[in-house]
């Protein structure tokens, strides 16, 4: 796979940047590859929120390392939210509950919802994107691998959630016109 830049990624002579929430899982890894293919300069943010499956962060780091060895320049930062999110109730982060196994059903998987997780992650990557705008004067996409198949279980994977979040971010920040959500796996359901 070769990295390339198209005219649509150019912003006054510079490359449009992307900041993405990168778990290292299947959805975010496929999104990272898509962004590479589309020619974006990418900053990946992985979150340690006290999740029981620390393999995600290990996979994220391994995936980035592999891509760097292939010649791709990708920034990768790991943000530690364990203290803040330790007060939340979810089977993914508390020892008081077990993570359900087996078929991916709403009733069974509801315990895996981490309250407000995608809003928190989006806020952090949005703030980071605003910092890039201020330093570099470029447009930035903030990307998440959320997809429409998750919305039945995870309310923060719904198109209307991201539309509302985008409106709130634009109201609450200067330079927000330079930032857009990039959500290709729910893109057909939403226009932000």
What would you call each of these model-derived segments?
Residues 2-190:
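ATP-dependent adenylation/nucleotidyltransferase module used to activate substrates
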